[in-house]
Structures are given as C-alpha cells and as structure tokens.
Amino acid sequence: MSLLCVKDLANALSATAVGNTNLKIKRAAEPQDAENDDLAIATSSSFLSEISGSAARVALLSEGTDWTALDLDAAILVARPRFAMSALSKVLDQRWRNGPDSIHPLAVIHPTAAIAPGARIGAFCVIGEGVSLGANAWLGVHISISNGSQIGSDATLMDGVRIGFDVQIGDRFIAQPGAVIGADGFSFVTPERSAIENVRETLGNTQDAAPQKFDRIHSLGSVKIGDDVEVGANSCIDRGTIRNTSIGHGCKFDNLVQIGHNVKIGNNCLICAQVGIAGSTTLGKNVVLGGQTGVSDNLFVGDNAITGGATKVLANVPAGRVMLGYPAMKMETQLNIYKTLRRLPRLMRDIKKLKSDSSESN
C-alpha cells in the first residue's frame, strides 16, 4: 500500500493538519493498536488517554482537542468525526481497485455484451447476451450477469453476485458478496379461495378451506435501481410480477435484506440487516428501517419514517413517524405500554392486598 502524507490526507478530508504534516501514514488504527506509521483514530474523549501509551505519532482528533498535550508529532482535526470517517475510509480502502484493468481468461463474455473501458473482470464471471457494463467496472470472481441487463459506470460487484435478466442499474453501484438482484418474486395462488385469504379477511378464521396446491405466478417485470445504491452481502431484491421492482437513488441495504416483488423504494433510504419488505409495498424518501423490521405487503411507509429494531409494520405509516414494536405503533406509545407492563406485577400485588384487606374488614 502506498503511504500518504498527513497534509494530503487532511486535504482529502477537508480538515486541518497541524504539526509535522509531511509525516507518512500507512493505515488507520485504534490508539492501543497504533504503530508509528499509523493514524490513530481518537475522535472520542474515551480514546485520548490511550494515545500517550501508544506508538502513534499522528492522530485524527476532534476540533478543539489539545493535540500538543498528547505527545504527538502531528494531528488532523475534524469538525464532525463520524462524517470524516467516510472520506478517510474511502481514501485508505484499497481492496477493490488494486491491480491492472483486465479481463481474466476464465471469464465468459457473450460477443454481444458491451464492456466499457477500464473494466476489471475476475475469473469465472459469466456475462450474458446484450449486457451493457459501464466504464471502470470492477467484478470479483464467480459473478453472473444475465441477458439484457445494464449496469452504469464505476460498478463494484464482489464475489458471487448474481444479476438477473434485464435488470437496470445506475452508476456507482456496489454489491457485496452473494447479493442477488432480479430473482423471481415469491408469488403463488390457489385455484379456489385459500385458507390464507380467509384468515387475512377474518383475522383468524380459516372457514374450513380445503387444502389446495399452489400455482406459480411468474415474474414478468424486472428490477430498476438508481445511482449510488449499495446492497449488502446475501441480500435479495426480487423482480416484479408485471411492473419493475424499483429502488431509488442513494439507497443503502445492509446484509441479509429481502425486498419482495413490486416493492418501490424512494431515494436515500437506509435498510438495516434482516429487514424484510413484502410485495407491492411502497417506501417514501429518506426512510430508515431498523434491523429485523418486517413490513407487510401492499402498505405505504411515508417519507422520513423510522422504525426501531424488530418492529413489525402491519399498517400504513405516515410521513415522519417513528415506529416501534409488534404491531408497530408510535415509539412513545410503545414505550409507555412497555413501562406500564413492567409495573403490572406490582399493580397485581396491590390489587391482591386490597382484596385481602377488604375481606378482613368485612
């Protein structure tokens, strides 16, 4: 890895460099693990005490920190430390783009596929008929891109990614290992009215529906993804039944996320690990779904809504609402219910005592 000098790194972070700004940095490290050519990350006050006993000569610090008192030779001072970590990690992360642009001889590329300049395509990749791959694409190994799919410039597809038929993806797309974009949706129907339909309508009564076989509804739509979208490891975005499943610009998906058929997600949504969104549900812009949130089918979640971890959304959510619990309700309501439940044993003891006192007085 090439070494970076302090002043160049500070410029990349739009930060202030102080001290010996010509010192070279190899990598970032926590203070207790830092060596003399590392950048110690000590933006939290809890880490400052660890710098003195470390080998670190340079540290990333919050603005206003007295770096001269920490026995450092130089420092980079930032106004918003967590935001600075975005630029810092981008500069220091050399994993994806190492090596010359090339197409591995064990890759299989259809003659009609259009591969723009700057591509790096690893072994055992299979690129189908009519595929369009934008400039500077980086593909790991064992990746498949099915016929007719189009991917914009500066894409990064990690090992084992699967892109289905006729998927449309914008620029600067990142897919972590094992992500699957464009598999068929989970959609089945019975010849006659099923027990599932009866239960949904009556909230519990199967009405003696006879067992039936499930017939497949094929997925004739595809998936359309905007620019600057990231999809985590082993996450799945299913293709639509008739219309496309749609993902807006700037959306970020954690690992193990399931997006059902016909789902429409607005721009800049953040979807955490193990979230499941059932078919034909629409999310507005800037929605955040905490880990293990489940969203039922055919619902609408408004702009800027947020769900806490393990929330189960069974009804529409208004814009700007913060939801928690199963079933999902306003967070403050859910917390009040939780507090009340915690008081319930004491309340029952008080009632029992009142009944006992009343019986004795009679």
PLM features: residue spans?
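Terminal amphipathic alpha-helical/low-complexity segments used for targeting or macromolecular assembly
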Residues: 1-106, 167, 172, 178-179, ...
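Structural signal for interior beta-strand "rungs" in well-ordered beta-sheet cores
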Residues: 41, 102-194, 201-330
